[in-house]
């Protein structure tokens, strides 16, 4: 996959600084283009990662009931404004045929999908589809809640407003009780 071109990012950041009337050569900004390029390489590292790769490790386990990893912290960049949004992902699935993956793999997949220019809706559905395609579970449910800086620091300026998205597949789509169980676990504070 294509690597991030840090040199090109540095040049672009210098141009942005000049375009807003700043001097990119002043002391406080001198290393800013390099810092931004390094940061972009990190926060967009998911562009070079397929979330499905995290589900290649499968354990044969006779468990066909709910598995839920909740409160997976993530951060991403809004593809419309290139400003951060951040929050928590909750990932649930019901294994089929003994195909269980490591719990950390669910968190790693969230991170891989989030670390790219993104929409929250796409994060949610991509995680769900990755699990469906690799583990073939009875059902998958992904709920993502996030605060978007594009709504906090510009435009409508509504700090604290959270956006919630969900992707529901398989048994969770058809069984209201199964859906309710996941939502109840998510809601519960320990």
UniProtKB/Swiss-Prot annotation:
Activity-regulation annotation: K(+) ions moderately increases the Vmax, whereas UTP and Ca(2+) and Mg(2+) ions drastically increase the Km for GTP.
GO MF annotations in UniProt: GTP binding; GTP cyclohydrolase I activity; zinc ion binding
Residues that bind Zn(2+): 78, 81, 150
Subunit structure: Toroid-shaped homodecamer, composed of two pentamers of five dimers.
Substrates-to-products reaction catalysed: GTP + H2O = 7,8-dihydroneopterin 3'-triphosphate + formate + H(+)
Organism per entry: Bacillus subtilis (strain 168)
Pathway connected to this protein: Cofactor biosynthesis; 7,8-dihydroneopterin triphosphate biosynthesis; 7,8-dihydroneopterin triphosphate from GTP: step 1/1
Protein name as it appears in the record: GTP cyclohydrolase 1
Keywords, sorted A to Z: GTP-binding, Hydrolase, Metal-binding, Nucleotide-binding, One-carbon metabolism, Zinc
PROSITE patterns reported in the protein's UniProt record: GTP_CYCLOHYDROL_1_1, GTP_CYCLOHYDROL_1_2
Gene Ontology annotations for the cellular component aspect, listed alphabetically: cytoplasm
CDD domains: GTP_cyclohydro1 (cd00642)
């Amino acid at each position: 996959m294509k690597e991030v071109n840090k040199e090109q990012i540095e040049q672009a950041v210098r141009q942005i600084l000049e375009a807003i009337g700043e001097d990119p050569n002043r002391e406080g900004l001198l290393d800013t283009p390099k810092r931004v390029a390094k940061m972009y390489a990190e926060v967009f590292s998911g562009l070079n990662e397929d979330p499905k790769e995290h589900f290649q490790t499968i354990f044969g386990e006779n468990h066909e009931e709910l598995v839920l990893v909740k409160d997976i912290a993530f951060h991403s960049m809004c593809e419309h404004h290139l400003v951060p949004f951040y929050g928590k992902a909750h990932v649930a699935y019901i294994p089929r045929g003994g195909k269980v993956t490591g719990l950390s793999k669910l968190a790693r997949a969230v991170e891989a999908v989030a670390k790219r220019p993104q929409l929250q809706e796409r994060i949610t559905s991509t995680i769900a589809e990755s699990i469906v395609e690799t583990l073939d579970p009875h059902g998958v449910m992904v709920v993502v809640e996030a605060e978007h800086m594009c709504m906090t620091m510009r435009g409508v300026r509504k700090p604290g407003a959270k956006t919630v998205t969900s992707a529901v597949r398989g048994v969770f789509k058809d069984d209201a009780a199964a859906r309710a169980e996941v939502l109840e676990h998510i809601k519960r504070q320990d």
